[in-house]
Amino acid sequence: MVRIAINGFGRIGRLVLRIALSRKNIEVVAINDPFITVDYAAYMFKYDSTHGRFDGEVSHDGKALIIDGKKVLVFQERDPATLPWGAEKIDIAIDSTGIFKELDSAQKHIDAGAKKVVITAPSSTAPMFVVGVNEDKYAGQTIVSNASCTTNCLAPLAKIINNAFGIEEGLMTTVHSITATQKTVDGPSHKDWRGGRTASGNIIPSSTGAAKAVGKVLPELQGKLTGMAFRVPTVDVSVVDLTVKLAKPATYEEIKAVVKKASENELKGVMGYTEDAVVSSDFLGDTHSSIFDAAAGIQLSPQFVKLVSWYDNEFGYSTRVVDLVELVAKN
């Protein structure tokens, strides 16, 4: 039984808790969030505007959440180094704050007594692992990153296509649902002026490092992909549009067949495949990292194609976080 703690009880932290509770080999011991009191944590965990009510009993005793009779301690420390991870025998701390995402800052969890750390954000210093893509390269590193939700969608698809046909170069666009960093009405956003505009009333062009990060988990694609994002007024579920120049000519039928085969074999559970006339809400709660939309892609020539793949940027990603925790626990 692996003992875990969750730092940061936001969208990802709460969903990671939901998913972890359903895994027999994981015990969630504690959560920490300096901005959330225990009674508020109970409320936020119980009710979710996007994914619905938690299917179980949720209460608290003033110090801990009580979920279906099981206690989960709640702390409110700003500095992770002061958390009692040693006393609580924490094997893996999951950091979903978006703040402690580099080796030096995530080290605070180790200093507090945790054995390992999984960061739920891309990192420029911690090694990044994408389940289904490069998790076989995990060699016991103490602090790891689960990359971003968009990299988790793009990388499995890019791996399949590159292995079968070769990718010479490509551009990615993610049409991405709103996230917590955006504004309900126009407000100050000094680093990203467009990002400060009303989330619910605009299509907002934005930057993303997700495509370049694929080169970190698939070195053979280093320098071959880049991309951008459009933030759109949907609450959850996003879609990747990958336009690539192939090294080897292929028909669209051949591409579909290769992706379908991978989704049923080595990437089962990570890569999905559909030929249905789907829209974004059809993927709410989908646990795949990426679901290939066979009916949406187009081909211009034997070596130039646009491929489309959906992802629940909250739930699919959080599922992979827990998968990575299990992998780290085994090694």
Swiss-Prot record:
It is found in: Cytoplasm. D-glyceraldehyde 3-phosphate binds at S148, C149, T150, T179, T208, G209, R231. InterPro entries: GlycerAld/Erythrose_P_DH (IPR020831), GlycerAld_3-P_DH_AS (IPR020830), GlycerAld_3-P_DH_cat (IPR020829), GlycerAld_3-P_DH_NAD(P)-bd (IPR020828), Glyceraldehyde-3-P_DH_1 (IPR006424), NAD(P)-bd_dom_sf (IPR036291). Its main location: cytoplasm. Pfam families: Gp_dh_C, Gp_dh_N. It catalyses: D-glyceraldehyde 3-phosphate + phosphate + NAD(+) = (2R)-3-phospho-glyceroyl phosphate + NADH + H(+). The keyword 4Fe-4S does not apply. SMART domains: Gp_dh_N. Keywords: Cytoplasm, Glycolysis, NAD, Oxidoreductase, Phosphoprotein. The record marks H176 as: Activates thiol group during catalysis. Pathway: Carbohydrate degradation; glycolysis; pyruvate from D-glyceraldehyde 3-phosphate: step 1/5. The modification Phosphoserine is found at S148, S177, S200. Disulfide bonds: none annotated. The active site is at C149 (nucleophile). GO terms for biological process: glucose metabolic process; glycolytic process. GO terms for molecular function: glyceraldehyde-3-phosphate dehydrogenase (NAD+) (phosphorylating) activity; NAD binding; NADP binding. GO terms for cellular component: cytosol; external encapsulating structure. PROSITE patterns: GAPDH. It is an enzyme of class 1 (oxidoreductase). NAD(+) binds at R11, I12, D33, E77, N313. Homotetramer. NCBIfam families: GAPDH-I (TIGR01534). Belongs to the glyceraldehyde-3-phosphate dehydrogenase family. This is Glyceraldehyde-3-phosphate dehydrogenase 3. The lineage of its organism: Eukaryota, Fungi, Dikarya, Ascomycota, Saccharomycotina.
